[in-house]
From Swiss-Prot:
Pfam families: Aldedh (PF00171). Gene3D superfamilies: Aldehyde Dehydrogenase, Chain A, domain 1 (3.40.605.10), Aldehyde Dehydrogenase, Chain A, domain 2 (3.40.309.10). Belongs to the aldehyde dehydrogenase family. One of its GO terms (molecular function) is aldehyde dehydrogenase (NAD+) activity. This is Putative aldehyde dehydrogenase. The keyword Amino-acid biosynthesis does not apply. Its EC number is 1.2.1.3.
Amino acid sequence: MRDYTKQYINGEWVESNSNETIEVINPATEEVIGKVAKGNKADVDKAVEAADNVYLEFRHTSVKERQALLDKIVKEYENRKDDIVQAITDELGAPLSLSERVHYQMGLNHFVAARDALDNYEFEERRGDDLVVKEAIGVSGLITPWNFPTNQTSLKLAAAFAAGSPVVLKPSEETPFAAVILAEIFDKVGVPKGVFNLVNGDGAGVGNPLSEHPKVRMMSFTGSGPTGSKIMEKAAKDFKKVSLELGGKSPYIVLDDVDIKEAAKATTGKVVNNTGQVCTAGTRVLVPNKIKDAFLAELKEQFSQVRVGNPREDGTQVGPIISKKQFDQVQNYINKGIEEGAELFYGGPGKPEGLEKGYFARPTIFINVDNQMTIAQEEIFGPVMSVITYNDLDEAIQIANDTKYGLAGYVIGKDKETLHKVARSIEAGTVEINEAGRKPDLPFGGYKQSGLGREWGDYGIEEFLEVKSIAGYFK
C-alpha cells in the first residue's frame, strides 16, 4: 500500500492543509493500492507563493545551468526506471512491457529533448540596433491526465525547467504515483526550492484554485475538452496564457495500394495501444471500397491475436480501462453504435471471457459506420474502431476532416505523391505517414477543438516564455 499523503512544496514534503485523502484503485484488480492527499486552496496558495518567491532567481539562471539541471534529472530518472514502470502498471493497469517501452521511455525522451533543445535555442535575437528577448513567463500551473502519467507530466515539466519557469503540478488523482516519483527525483538532484511544487487532489479542490490564482501566469492542461474550456474561462479572468492539449477522433486513411496485412496490423495497434486510452488514437479507419473485404478479413485476424489480460503476465498486450466510470462510458458507446445501426464486426459489449474482475473491455470493431454516427464523432477513449469506406481520395479527405477535432491523422500506402497529398490535406496538428512515429523534438498539438499551443521540444519551451522587444539596445 502506497501512502503519499504529503504535498511537495518549496523543496519539502509537508502535511496537506486538508485531512482528507483520495484512494487510488488498481483497475486490473479493483483493489485500493494507495492513497494521496486531497489538497485544497490553502495548499495551492502555499505552493504558488513558493514558486513566485523563486521566480526571478530561476528566470535569471543561465542556459547552461538549466541544461545541467535537466541532465541530472535524466540520469536520476534512469536510475528510477523500475519504480516508474511498477507504479504505472499498478495505477494505470498498463502491461509491464508497455509501461517500460512507452510510458517510462516517453517520459525520459522529453527530458532529453528539452535538454538537447537548449544546445541551439536562441533566447535573444539582435535586429539591427534592437534586441528581442525571450524570458520565462513566470509561475506556471500544470494539470495532467491519467492516461500517460509520465509522458504528459514530463513534457510540461521539462519545457518549463528549460525556459526557467517555476511550476505547480496537479497530476490526475487516478494516477498520481508517477508524479510523486518525479518529485523524489527532483528532490534528490537538487531542483531549487520552489521551482517544483506538487499538490495532489481533485479538480475542485486543486485544479480550480490553481487556474484562478492571480500569481499564476500560465496554465498548461492536458485532458478533456469540457475541462479545458472551464480552465480557459477561469484563466481569462486575469488573462493568463493557456496551453491546452485536448481530445481527438483521429482518422487513419488506408490507401488502395497498401500492403493489406501491414495496414491491418498498423490500424489495430493505433486502436488497442494503451487500451485505446490515447488522445491520438486512430479510431476512424477509412478504407477504399475496392479492398474492403480483404482488409476486414485481415483486420479480424489481427484483432483475434490481441491478448487482453493481467498486466503483470507475460504476453499481455492490453490491460484494463482506468476506472469503473470510464469502463461504463466505453460500454455506453458500444451500445450506442449498435443502436444507431453500425454493424458489430468484432468484440462488443461486456468483458472478455475469464476477466470478470477488473475493468477489462473487449477490443471492438464496427463496420458500415456513417461518419455522422456518435461513435465516429465522439471520443470514446477505449479500444473501439469504426471502419468507414470511401470511393475516392477526395471523399476520404472530406470524411477525415469532418470532425470537430484535429489532433492527429494517419495515412498508409505506397505512392509517395498520394501520401504527401493526404498528409498535407488532413486538418490536424500531427500527421504520420506509414507509421513513422512522432519524435520528441517535433511540435505536438491540435487544430480546432483539440487544443491551443504546442508542446514537445523547442516549441514546448516557447509556451513557457514571454517575448520582449528592447529598442535601441545596441545604439
